[in-house]
């Protein structure tokens, strides 16, 4: 059985799943949650990922990083990055035109790229899967929003590499959700619209599903719209209300903001099932308690424009697929934000009262589909996956700049991938020795309005009048939606090519290798820390249980012996209180000291008729019935039993 998993790397939450024996398991994390917050926190002593990181966000706002997906593959001066910076409690800095996150970690200032933060979340998902499956997990299918551009896809793939994963494929979230919906559907062709509104991104895809063939007809979306934006509206609303009531601006205090944001997120969820909810935060800012309430209608009004804007991509997809809305057979809602009643109502009204299909779990569908795809790519023989074929599309048109800054498209948007397209171009001036080939993606007529993916030079063209040399440019989009471009001059056979990986902002091979090594180092440190804590806890529990056993020993021991052990145990406990950051070795030494004193006395107690019932096995060297202690260097240690 292959141990390949599907990972839904979300803006706010991530989810991991595994396909085996004809079924998909969504894997719960160590807290028992089936989704894990995409949060990473750095403290003086350790690095926290997931629930642990999110839970301490209010105490440590400037070193708790979230929303890396809104930064990944983007430039620092991207207007959306600039707008987000205003909401982020952590510090973003500009490194070679790319955003990096600056935090304090173990007493020093560290910079991390969004890829590194995402790789830590992916690493956490990998560990979650490994502890459930009981085996190493190397291969994964990772999902991205369908509307992610080339650089965002490439950066996500890099994050997987840094996490020590072999990324089998990057697939689009709505397509993965469609697999979850259609895996058991057999029979006539149906048109399915996937409406995926998550924590930070929004996608709409239209597919035709027939007998295991999933063909994406068109896709559209907004890589910067989701639940976070609704939270922001609530946060701003309450900041204003707090100002009105108390004449104070709490937005200057990051801790207050984080507590308010957490309360807003909770309120938003409650409003999906209740018509109104109260928000109560004690001592929010400068000792002022903030008690207020909000109705569903008010929330809908605050987010009205955002909710309405979700219908634009729906219209675009129908136009691109040349379908009328009456021809859509099923509407499938994916992503936590589709639980908002107003969003559901807008969709239903748009499709003239047609109710959306609720057969799949909106939080888990994407990871589910990714797990199925991972099983297929690693050769799973299940009957369910045998005939499954995925035909996805490139979300944005791809082309090169020709004379006058014109965008000449080679691959139009919504072309099925993988795809390959060649065109012949020529020189613009007589005796031109070389051409600069600039690759863009986007829908506008002029390249300056589109996104530059990369450029390369094809030189050594022999002198000739303009228009004579023949330069063949080939675009090749692979199944991850990542582009390779090559150019060859027909006369001389001179060629040059690049994988478009956004030269401007792409991590180089060396960068990635360095980050992989760093990730290993962090992992080792995390493990060291957890071993240190285990030693500390062991010492503490043994000291306390010794104290208790002695106090219940009655006249089975001489008073002098009892005093000796009690004194040593109390000494150990007070040492622990003042040395919480000691090393593992120090804790182990203290344990040995304690056991050297206690073990001989405790064995007297056991020979005198055993420890009192309640303390059986609680003391170190707890050998019931006076069995001799095992010959161990440190004296036997017994796990506590209830």
UniProtKB/Swiss-Prot annotation:
Any one GO molecular-function label of the UniProt entry: ATP binding
Residues recorded as bearing Phosphoserine in the entry: 62, 551, 603
Any single GO CC term annotated in Swiss-Prot or TrEMBL for this entry: fungal-type vacuole membrane
SUPFAM superfamilies: Actin-like ATPase domain, Heat shock protein 70kD (HSP70), C-terminal subdomain, Heat shock protein 70kD (HSP70), peptide-binding domain
Post-translational modification N-acetylserine, affected residues: 2
Domain of life of the organism encoding this protein: Eukaryota
The keyword Membrane is assigned to this record: no
Keywords: Acetylation, ATP-binding, Cell wall, Cytoplasm, Isopeptide bond, Nucleotide-binding, Phosphoprotein, Secreted, Stress response, Ubl conjugation
Family under the similarity heading: Belongs to the heat shock protein 70 family.
PANTHER family: HEAT SHOCK PROTEIN 70KDA (PTHR19375)
Subunit description: Binds human HTN3/histatin-5, a peptide from saliva, and mediates its fungicidal activity. Interacts with polyadenylate-binding protein PAB1 and Hsp70 chaperone SSA1 on translating ribosomes. Interacts with NAP1.
Function: May play a role in the transport of polypeptides both across the mitochondrial membranes and into the endoplasmic reticulum. A functional difference between SSA1 and SSA2 proteins is expected. SSA1 can participate in the ATP-dependent disassembly of clathrin-coated vesicles.
Name this polypeptide is given: Heat shock protein SSA1
């Amino acid at each position: 059985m292959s141990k390949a998993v599907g990972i839904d790397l979300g803006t706010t939450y991530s989810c991991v799943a595994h396909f085996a024996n004809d079924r998909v398991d969504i894997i719960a994390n160590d807290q028992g949650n089936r989704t894990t917050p995409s949060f990473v926190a750095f403290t003086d002593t350790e690095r926290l990922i997931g629930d642990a990181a999110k839970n301490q966000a209010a105490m440590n706002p400037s070193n708790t990083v979230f929303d890396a997906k809104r930064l990944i593959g983007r430039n620092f001066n991207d207007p959306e990055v600039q707008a987000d910076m205003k909401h982020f409690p952590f510090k973003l800095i500009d490194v070679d035109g790319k955003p990096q996150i600056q935090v304090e970690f173990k007493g020093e200032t560290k910079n991390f790229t969004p890829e590194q933060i995402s790789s830590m979340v992916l690493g956490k998902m990998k560990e979650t899967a490994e502890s459930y499956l009981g085996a190493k997990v190397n291969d994964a299918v990772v999902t991205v929003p369908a509307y992610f551009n080339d650089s965002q896809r490439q950066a996500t793939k890099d994050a997987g590499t840094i996490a020590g994963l072999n990324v089998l494929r990057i697939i689009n979230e709505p397509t993965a959700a469609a697999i979850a919906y259609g895996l058991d559907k057999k029979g006539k062709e149906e048109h399915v619209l996937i409406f995926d509104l998550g924590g930070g991104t929004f996608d709409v895809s239209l597919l035709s599903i027939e007998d295991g063939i999933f063909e994406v007809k068109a896709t559209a979306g907004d890589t910067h719209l989701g639940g976070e934006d609704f939270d922001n509206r609530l946060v701003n609303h309450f900041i204003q209300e707090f100002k009105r009531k108390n004449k104070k601006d709490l937005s200057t205090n990051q801790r207050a903001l984080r507590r308010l944001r957490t309360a807003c997120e909770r309120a938003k969820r409650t409003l999906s099932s209740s018509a109104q909810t109260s928000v109560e935060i004690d001592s929010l800012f400068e000792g002022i308690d903030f008690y207020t309430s909000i109705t569903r209608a008010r929330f809908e009004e605050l987010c009205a424009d955002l909710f309405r804007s979700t219908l634009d991509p729906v219209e675009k997809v129908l136009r691109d697929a040349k379908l009328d809305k009456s021809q859509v057979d099923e509407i499938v809602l994916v992503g936590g934000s589709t639980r908002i009643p107003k969003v559901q109502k807008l969709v239903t009204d748009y499709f003239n009262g047609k109710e959306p299909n609720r057969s799949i779990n909106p939080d888990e569908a994407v990871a589910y589909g990714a797990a199925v795809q991972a099983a297929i790519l690693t050769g799973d023989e299940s009957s369910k996956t045998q005939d499954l074929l995925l035909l996805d599309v490139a979300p944005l048109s791809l082309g090169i700049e020709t004379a006058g800054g014109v965008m000449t498209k080679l691959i139009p948007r919504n072309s099925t991938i993988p795809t390959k397209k060649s065109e012949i171009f020529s020189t613009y001036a007589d005796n031109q020795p070389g051409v600069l080939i600039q690759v863009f993606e986007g829908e506008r007529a002029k390249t300056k309005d589109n996104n530059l993916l990369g450029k390369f030079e094809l030189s050594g063209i022999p002198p000739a009048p303009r228009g004579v040399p023949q330069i063949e440019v080939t675009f090749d989009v692979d199944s991850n939606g990542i582009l390779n471009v090559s150019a060859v001059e027909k006369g001389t056979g001179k060629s040059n090519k690049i994988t478009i990986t956004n030269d401007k902002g792409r991590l180089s091979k060396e960068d990635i290798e360095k980050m992989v090594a760093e990730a290993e180092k962090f992992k080792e440190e995390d493990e060291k820390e957890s071993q240190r804590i285990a030693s500390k806890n062991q010492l503490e529990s043994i000291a306390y249980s010794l104290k208790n056993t002695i106090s219940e020993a009655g006249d089975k021991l001489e008073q002098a012996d009892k005093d000796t052990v009690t004194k040593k145990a109390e000494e150990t406990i007070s040492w622990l209180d003042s040395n919480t950051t000691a090393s593992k070795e120090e804790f182990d030494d203290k344990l040995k000291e304690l056991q050297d004193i206690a073990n001989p006395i405790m064995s007297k107690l056991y020979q005198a008729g055993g420890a009192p019932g309640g303390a059986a096995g609680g003391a170190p060297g707890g050998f019931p019935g006076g069995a001799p202690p095992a010959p161990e260097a440190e004296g036997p240690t017994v796990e506590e039993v209830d």
